[in-house]
Amino acid sequence: MPDAVKVGFVPFSTASRGTLVVFCDETLKFGRAAGKALGSSAGLVKRAAAANQFKGKSATTLDILAPEGLKADRLIVVGVGKTPALKSSDFLKLGGVIAGKVRSDNNGVTIIAELPSATMEPDLSASLASGIRLRAYKFDRYKTRKKEGDDAVNRADVSIAVADVAAAKKAFAPVNHVVNGVIIARDLVNEPPNVLYPEEFARRASRLRAMGVGIDVLDVKAMTKLGMGALLGVGQGSARPSRTVVMRWNGGKKGEPPVAFVGKGVCFDTGGISIKPANGMEEMKGDMGGAACVVGLMHALAARKAKVNAIGAIGIVENMPDGSAQRPGDIVTSMSGQTIEIINTDAEGRLVLADVLWYVARKFKPKVMIDLATLTGAIMVALGTEHAGLFSNNDELSERLTRAGLDTGERVWRMPLAPEYDKLIDSKFADMKNTGGRHGGSITAAQFLQRFVDDTPWAHLDIAGTAMGAPKSDINQSWGSGFGVRLLDRLVAEHYETKR
């Protein structure tokens, strides 16, 4: 998708035309540059605030015609609340709030990025710019008739006025690459399934070659030779052949074990022979949200030249019913040699992940391995749409993911793993079965995956409630959210990049 908005940094002295945006705290105090820009109009603005009961609380806005004397036509005052408590994630949200207010403004927007009572560091300006871009995103490439104003955001030119332009640009550069990764993930999730099928998904992931990412695409013949019977069983009812794509970024020390990310990529999930209800089935185009995140993350790591060795692996299939489709009662042999009784063909994502997890663990011996999957409806019953489910065999990794989630706003909540749950997936006829019954469904799904990771420090993120169809937020108005890219990039940056 073309970029929805142009964002740049300019000095405080830049003239403000079109819309002027300034910040104030709960005392309605403005920063020095904003006060200078407002001049004698500051008193009028405060009277307008009183008339509109605007109190400067965080993320609230006062939107008025610019008072006489300002070069701007429109003035938006954005509350920041109590400034000492502000964090980077707060400015991400504020950027989204501003983008939501100026979508229809094609006369230019200038934001004076200055706090009333504190210095606004370059990283906060970078977060502000990121929030603007994330909120401005929309997916409308298949609309041939557009309502008046639909394209206004494409003409929005946002200038962020800062004290140090060079420092702001430097801070924004790596963050902007991460935003691009989120947008890539959103685009993939939003694509219709007749356009984004396994072969096409593999082609799009392969575009990362141009950024220095090593790419291996395993076709059906290669996966058959490897013994990936669990993954191949899922796709055998589809006319679209399955693929596994392995992406390698070598930005760390030579020979250092990589961090690995594995994504579920079911491009469309009918449920197979255990077919889903027709109502809402169209949303199963997003059942590849985990794989989309991994591709977006690998883009971000490569684009910002992350000092880490990283593996991204995605298993890409369609789960369709036909005469050759997998049946309930079938027994398949996974790459690990473990056998699996198929109880429900709609519990297919764990079968895909089982083979890819085993392949990555054995071939690359990663220091940590994290998988992402829109795996279970049960996690939505447990956690709703505000947290992803986190399952892990490693406390340190779990704590790091939780912290990264709090820092980025992509929050996770740890769920239990225990032998009592694991025994629920034992089978009378095979080593295990692919469902463990009605209760604790997200837990038994994670227990299934754990059988394919050996002793690798591992975490599973069930993103069924956060990757697609989640409630709209200040930084996302799209059906596909791109959840996980910012979370995992933060994890890598904080804990796994080489310090040079």
UniProtKB/Swiss-Prot annotation:
Mind listing the GO molecular function terms for this protein? manganese ion binding; metalloaminopeptidase activity
CDD domains per the record?
Peptidase_M17
Active site at 276, 350
EC annotation from Swiss-Prot or TrEMBL:
3.4.11.1, 3.4.11.10
Q: Where in the cell is it found?
A: Cytoplasm
PROSITE patterns, alphabetized: CYTOSOL_AP (PS00631)
Q: Which GO terms describe its cellular component?
A: cytoplasm
Annotated Mn(2+) 1 binding lies at 269, 346, 348
State where it is primarily located: cytoplasm
State the UniProt keywords alphabetically. Aminopeptidase, Cytoplasm, Hydrolase, Manganese, Metal-binding, Protease
Q: Which GO terms describe its biological process?
A: proteolysis
Its annotated function is as follows: Presumably involved in the processing and regular turnover of intracellular proteins. Catalyzes the removal of unsubstituted N-terminal amino acids from various peptides.
Q: What's the protein here called?
A: Probable cytosol aminopeptidase
